[in-house]
């Protein structure tokens, strides 16, 4: 929530740049013994649309995710919605990248992808709940 306070200081640009680089997050691993630790960044559906990272045929699915499935009038299939979610996950995964995981023969589990998506849209606090 935005607020106005007299004792508030303007955020240092270096701090913003550091935050934009993402943070290290521990995720479920491919096995229970070894967690998957990755650097994740926040993502913006509207920013991805403006940057052309979400193709036009998937805009309705992005709208549905943005507005919430119960509120949205956008007509999108489950497959289209899953594709948009995967694009957000790829955007959020800073280190290793999705390309690096694929090159290593790895694909994210549903649990990993879901947690990365939640982090990308809502931040680290949602993973702590």
Please report, for each region that a protein language model flagged, where it lies by residue:
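Short, charged/polar N-terminal "headpieces" of proteins
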Residues: 1-60, 129
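C-terminal charged interaction modules
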Residues: 4-6, 95-129
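Low-complexity, intrinsically disordered short peptide segments enriched in small/polar/basic residues
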Residues: 7, 34, 46, 51, ...
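Polar/charged alpha-helical tracts
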Residues: 11-22, 57-67, 83, 99-103, ...
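Hydrophobic beta-strand residues in large extracellular and virion-surface proteins
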Residues: 25, 38-40, 89, 116, ...
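Acidic, aromatic-enriched beta-alpha/helix-loop junctions
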Residues: 45-83
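Amphipathic protein-protein interaction modules
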Residues: 75-103, 107
């Amino acid at each position: 929530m935005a607020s106005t306070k007299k004792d508030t200081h303007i955020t240092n640009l270096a701090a913003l740049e550091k935050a934009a680089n993402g943070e290290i997050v521990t995720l479920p691993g491919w096995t229970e013994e070894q967690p998957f630790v990755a650097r994740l960044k926040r993502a913006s559906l509207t920013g991805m649309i403006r940057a052309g990272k979400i193709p036009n045929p998937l805009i309705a699915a992005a709208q549905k995710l943005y507005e919430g499935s119960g509120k949205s009038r956008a007509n999108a299939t489950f497959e289209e919605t899953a594709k948009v979610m995967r694009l957000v996950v790829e955007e959020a995964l800073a280190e290793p990248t999705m390309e690096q995981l694929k090159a290593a023969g790895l694909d994210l589990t549903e649990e990993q992808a879901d947690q990365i998506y939640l982090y990308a849209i809502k931040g680290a606090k949602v993973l702590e709940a």
